[in-house]
Amino acid sequence: MQEPKNSQTLHDVANGASDLEGPLAWVGMEDIALPFRLANSAVNGRASAGVSLDATSARGIHMSRLYLALEALEHEEVTLSGLGAVLQRFLASHDGLARTAFLDLSGDVLIKRPALISPRAGWKAYPCALRCRQDTQGMQAVLEVTIGYSSTCPCSAALARQSIQQAFDEDFTDMPISHEAVRTWLGSEQGILATPHSQRSQAHLSLRLADDLETLPVTALIDTVEDALGTALQTAVKRVDEQAFALANGQNLMFCEDAARRVRHALQARDEVQGFRVRIVHAESLHAHDAVAHAEWNWTPNSP
C-alpha cells in the first residue's frame, strides 16, 4: 500500500508545550500483543512499555518509538541483555524527555512434565511476568511466576487418624486380632472412615534477579520450588501415579506457613536470586476463605 503523497511536514502535537506543567511518573502503552520465547517456550505474550516524562513542559512522549523498539523481542528468547537494550532504546528515543524506562512482559510458559511413575507426560502452564526498569542507577529486573501445587492440612490429617483409631477400637474391642483381619479392615471403607481435607494451592513468586545472568533460569527456579513443596500438580496420570501423588501428599502435610518457609529456604540457596517476595495461597476446602502467608528476603517495596 502506497503512502499518501504530501509535500508538507505532518505536524506532531506531542512536540508542543503543555498548558499545565509537571512531571509524570509513567507514560506509555499497556497490553500490547507481543510473541516472544521464554524458557524455550513460545509465549503468546503481552507487553507494557513506558517512560517517565521528566520534561515538565513537554506535552507528551513518542509512543510509536516505544512500540517499534519492541520488534527486537519478537519470537526471540528473552534475555536480560536483550531487555536492557530495548530499555536503552526507549531512553535514547526520548532524550531530554525521560530519565527512566519501564518494560513488562507477561504470558504463560508451557513446560512438559512427566508423570510420577508411569511413562505418561503432559503440559503445564506457568503464568510468568518480567518487570524491568532502567534508570540512572542501572537496570532492575523482577521475574514473577505462579506455581500450583497440592496441600493437605496437618490438623485435618491428625483428626482423620484419630477417627480411624476410634473406629478400630470399636470394631476390635474384645476380639482376637489377626494380621489378616486388620489388613482386611484397613482395606475397607471403615479403614478410611475419615480423610483429611486438601486444596489446590499456589505459590506466587516475585524474584529480583542478578543483573549478570546470561540466560533466565525460569525452569530451574520452578523446579527448585516444586521440589521443595513435594506436591506439584500433575498432568496425564495412571492409577499408579495417582497413588504416588496421594503418598506425596501424606508425606508433605503443610499449613500455608510451612509452605512459605520451604519456598523461602529453597530460594535463598539460589545464586541467581538477589531478593524475593513470596505469597502462598491455600484455597481452603474447609472454609470459604483462603489461608495466606508471605515471605520476604532482601526485598524492597519499590522493586519494579
From Swiss-Prot:
Gene Ontology molecular function, alphabetical: GTP cyclohydrolase I activity
Metabolic or biological pathway, per its Swiss-Prot or TrEMBL entry: Cofactor biosynthesis; 7,8-dihydroneopterin triphosphate biosynthesis; 7,8-dihydroneopterin triphosphate from GTP: step 1/1
UniProt record, GO biological process: tetrahydrofolate biosynthetic process
Pfam family membership, one: GCHY-1
UniProt keyword terms in alphabetical order: Hydrolase
Annotated site, May be catalytically important, chain positions: C153
Catalysed conversion reaction: GTP + H2O = 7,8-dihydroneopterin 3'-triphosphate + formate + H(+)
Enzyme Commission number: 3.5.4.16
InterPro entries hit by this protein: GTP_cyclohydrolase_FolE2, GTP_cyclohydrolase_FolE2/MptA
Enzyme class: hydrolase
HAMAP family, A to Z: GTP_cyclohydrol_B
Family: Belongs to the GTP cyclohydrolase IV family.
Function: Converts GTP to 7,8-dihydroneopterin triphosphate.
Protein name, UniProt field: GTP cyclohydrolase FolE2
Organism: Chromohalobacter salexigens (strain ATCC BAA-138 / DSM 3043 / CIP 106854 / NCIMB 13768 / 1H11)
Lineage start: Bacteria, Pseudomonadati, Pseudomonadota, Gammaproteobacteria, Oceanospirillales
